[in-house]
Amino acid sequence: VFAVNTVGTVLGAVLTGLVFLPVLGLASTLALGIGINALIGWVTLASRRGGVTRALVQGLVATAVLVAVVSLTLGERWSRAFVLGLWRDVRPPASIAEFRQRADIYNLAYHRDGAGSTVAILAVTNRAGQPSISLKVNGKADASSGEDMSTQILAGQLPMLLHPSAERVLVVGAGSGVTVGSILQHPTVKAVDLVEISPEVTEVAREHFAPFNHDALRNPRCHTHIEDAKTFLQTTPESFDIIVTEPSNPWMAGVAAVFSQEYYQDCLARLKPGGLCAQWIQAYETDDETFATVVATFGSVFPHVSLWQTSTSDLLLIGAAQPYRPDLQAMARRLAEPAVAADLGRIEITRPVNVLALQMVAFGDAFFLAPDGTTIHSDFHPVLEYRAQQAFFVRGMAMVPYRLNEVQRPRPRTLLGEHLARAPLTAEDCRALARQFAKIGIPQLPIFRSVLRRWQELQPKDPTVLRLLSTYAIQNPAPDGEVASLVSHPSFSNEEQLGDLNLMRQLADLLLLQHRTRRSAFHLPDSVRLEVFLGALTQLDPARQRTHRMRLAEVSWDRGNDARARVLFEEALDLDEKRFGPLDFSEDPGCPAGMMARLIDADLRAGDLKGALDKVLRFRRLGYIRPERMTGDEVLQMLARRVIVTAQSSLQK
């Protein structure tokens, strides 16, 4: 009996996974299982009466009929229901009618139940009348010819633009094949190895997404491997200039294994010296702690990491094992290659500034996004298996990368800052950025508005920028719109009425809020009036003069007057209470930390590690730096972590 049970169990598992599911599909396989169980019962009962052969024939016929009926009547309906992915929907259908309505919206262009996953293609026409197809794996959308195009293209193009001359590239996860197609647009590429565990996904990429991926999977330079990514990395003799790893979200069953430290170590072992590894991560259906775990794990192997934004809620980590500094001029030349330019033109990226504006955190900084003590996800301690699913359940979003986006700052540490220092923003740059942001979407609307304001300064009579400003003002009212009307109110605009100290404080608060809201790497608003009032308040409001001096230091720094900013900062922290009043910043508690981050940043840029470390230790004694937590000013915490780790590494050497 034991032997028969064992043989039956093994045969059932093998036949179901490798034969019945791929051939019959999930619904018919379930019907077959029901029929076989009923057949066994029917034959068992018949054996007592001696009619085993007749019962067996009857049972087989009944099972075949059941499978045929289910396949013909329920097959497509079953498939439609399962690929909808309602388990992700925060608002499930309220009725059967609504459920059927949702299921009928899409045209099921392809459906296949494979041994490892159910793969489907849904075709739909959007509101603009444009057709689009979406790849769904186990009910979860993993690629499309619509809103996902920017991420799919940039996952291939960004590392290719950053690398000086990539010849061999590995892509983990086929998806739509668009990433592979984008990589193949570079003439230096001799071979792309594509590793995908599901043959159904590669079939979809080859047959359905060919118009969108440049028919990449039929390109002779593309070599497709149906294999587990870890197995491939551990067995291939090849080395690669770039590895792009883009599995699904880590909360999907089994996917967290390709976010582990061991997996990244396997990637590093197959990278050539100077190679880059790019990891697609999602900011949606997650949280800051899960995001920190992914960054810390990736950074434990590739410590020189930068963070890039590829769409509204999709991000890309690009890391190297050694310090990495891209050549911006060479990047511009690669961007100008006709095939590359045409590929990026599909997502309105036409100029170097379009590419550089996507970098959120600079090389060498992104590793320090994760607080000290963040748990590393490994095969032996798979914390992401639980944490990612927990974060998915509460439908959160990782906000740290957006709060730390360097594009929001007038003097970014990113490649964009380096580029703008050499080539100031032009009207054509602004036009290109506006098209790009409108195409891919961007969560930080103030950045978009700052581009439009700079464009308006450069071309005040251009009807396009005026139309865009008015459109976005109507659709997305600016948070500083009310502030702008208040600061121009007669009570504030008439300087003679400002003998009232409370009115002066309120005006300074409003002007500073407007300044902070409007500043970015692209545009710095005029701050003369703000500086005049803050300067006056340092004399007229001695009880709060430390706050006024600290704010004035911040604005001076934004304007590039570093010497004045340093003097004001030191005065604001001076222990002489008789001269500067009580050491109290309760009116603007975040202002000192912001200035501390700027001063540490200045030392790092100047290569003065000792000066940066002295400031970190000083500010830590003051209670502003707590690198083990995701609290306080996040830029300050990130820079402090970088200084401490760099100093420790220098001592060890």
Name each model feature, range by range:
Residues 1-46:
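Membrane-embedded alpha-helical segments of integral membrane proteins
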Residues 45, 52-163, 168, 220, ...:
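Soluble small-group transferase modules, centered on the S-adenosyl donor enzyme superfamily
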Residues 140-295, 299, 311:
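The AdoMet/dcAdoMet-binding core of the Class I SAM-like
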Residues 432, 468, 506, 513, ...:
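"A position-specific structural signal for the A-helix of alpha-solenoid helical repeats
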Residues 440-442, 476-477, 514, 559, ...:
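Structural motif corresponding to the intra-repeat A-B loop/turn of tetratricopeptide repeats
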Residues 444-456, 479-495, 520-538, 564-574, ...:
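Alpha-helical repeat scaffolds
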